[in-house]
């Protein structure tokens, strides 16, 4: 195995380990919104993905329009509802989301041929307490950040079609 491939695999393994450490360092969930999102995903799991009754939003336009603002995110979270321990499901989902976010950021930096990409990501993680806190959340904004970094890399380095597809899923 050559040196570059070893560095790449080690970097990805480090991002995976960091993502799980961020989530499982504490037995608590970082943000109560994760409980809402995982429960909403559970409702889709139990009632089907086209379920559109939201009795908990009586005083919102969501009740009238029967639309879920985070529909794609809630579909993404359905597999994490197959665990008996809901907190574990939230934390596992958060670790996967943090890993995907950091991986997209890493890919964006590699696409732009930025040296020491893993070091820049580590600097980003510890740059402010709020960054680490947000990475610990089980919320859709983390994935949006990763997709935005990836879209920017395609914008700077060329690639209109990838930007189109990223925009469609983001």
Where are these regions (language model features)?
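Start-transfer (signal-anchor) and selected internal transmembrane alpha helices
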Residues: 1-24, 107-111
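Transmembrane-helix motifs of polytopic, lipid-linked glycan transferases
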Residues: 92-113
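Short hydrophobic/aromatic helix or loop-helix immediately within or flanking a transmembrane segment
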Residues: 60-85
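Helix-to-loop transition at the C-terminal end of transmembrane segments
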Residues: 21-35
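Extracytosolic helix-loop segments that constitute the early lumenal/periplasmic catalytic or substrate-binding loops
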Residues: 42-64, 72
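Membrane-interface transmembrane helices that cradle and orient dolichyl/undecaprenyl
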Residues: 148-163
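Transmembrane and membrane-interface helices of multi-pass
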Residues: 119-129
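Short acidic/glycine- and proline-prone juxtamembrane loop motifs at membrane-interface regions
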Residues: 133-142
